[in-house]
Amino acid sequence: MRGIRKGHALALRVGTPAKINLWLEIVRKREDGYHDLSSLMLPVAVYDHVEVAWSHEGGVRLSCDSAEVPDDRGNLAWRAADAYLEAAGVTRGVSIRLEKNIPVGAGMGGGSSDAAAVLLALNRLSENPLSEAVLHRLAVGLGADVPFFLHCVPALATGIGERLLPVHGIPDYPLLLVKPPISVSTGWVYGSLKLTRGESRIKLRSFLDRPWHLSEVLRNDLETVTLNEYPQLGQIKCWLMENGAVGSLMSGSGPTVFGVFAEQRLADGAGELARRVWKDCRVDVTRVLGTPVSARS
């Protein structure tokens, strides 16, 4: 988080990382309509940038360099600022500038990451910052993925995603991300889901003992919906495995598919080939982030 001067006002500029789900198990559907889950969430070095400053004008003003992103209450970052102002009793306005690089509707948490960044930036700018517990409550109210991005460290998410257990010892996996030119509605995917497990089957301790034995943990119950609707995603998964990945999975509700590689040079080489083979897709070669310092630089 970096402070910059704009006239007499101090603005904060924040790099907001994406995420992948190394596994995503849907445990049960709750009476309130939400789903309990178990997921290992990992921050990834693909970033949006968010600039936040107090404004003399009331309310929230948001601008973005992408036409895909709304500039009003339809934007999660806008709602994050509005929620913070109400919780903190602040009467000043907020100005937000988004620079989008994380694909929209990709299953990579871009909107949630931006929202968490706004909460953190406003708390840093505030003369009377809110407690961590209040920030967490605000984040939960905004969306299930937002609490994860308050800390941006590998974490086991349970409940609807609001209960987070930081996980140490995760390798900085080299990654190749491939996103077809489609967007997927998370609400549609969950609404179409039929499978529920009843309990989590993946054991965190066993995974940490053998973090490169990915075939034992790469599971995403939402694939049963998204891959059925978009067969290309299954083709990309197979292609990644045929071209050097040690594991491949759809992230979140999709449509982004990631491949995990044993070495960065192998991911780089596969990335060059992917750009030629999957010409209509967004391709990123990146890695998992292991510390909050690197994730929030």
Curated annotation (Swiss-Prot):
GO terms for molecular function: 4-(cytidine 5'-diphospho)-2-C-methyl-D-erythritol kinase activity; ATP binding. Gene3D superfamilies: 3.30.230.10, GHMP kinase, C-terminal domain. GO terms for biological process: isopentenyl diphosphate biosynthetic process, methylerythritol 4-phosphate pathway; terpenoid biosynthetic process. The keyword Nuclease does not apply. Coiled coil: none annotated. It comes from the Bacteria. It is an enzyme of class 2 (transferase). InterPro entries: GHMP_kinase_C_dom, GHMP_kinase_C_sf, GHMP_kinase_N_dom, IspE, Ribosomal_Su5_D2-typ_SF, Ribsml_uS5_D2-typ_fold_subgr. It catalyses: 4-CDP-2-C-methyl-D-erythritol + ATP = 4-CDP-2-C-methyl-D-erythritol 2-phosphate + ADP + H(+). Its EC number is 2.7.1.148. Pfam families: GHMP_kinases_C (PF08544), GHMP_kinases_N (PF00288). Keywords: ATP-binding, Isoprene biosynthesis, Kinase, Nucleotide-binding, Transferase. Pathway: Isoprenoid biosynthesis; isopentenyl diphosphate biosynthesis via DXP pathway; isopentenyl diphosphate from 1-deoxy-D-xylulose 5-phosphate: step 3/6. The active site is at K19, D145. ATP binds at P103, V104, G105, A106, G107, M108, G109, G110, G111, S112, S113. Catalyzes the phosphorylation of the position 2 hydroxy group of 4-diphosphocytidyl-2C-methyl-D-erythritol. Belongs to the GHMP kinase family. IspE subfamily. HAMAP family: IspE. NCBIfam families: ispE. This is 4-diphosphocytidyl-2-C-methyl-D-erythritol kinase. It comes from Syntrophobacter fumaroxidans (strain DSM 10017 / MPOB).
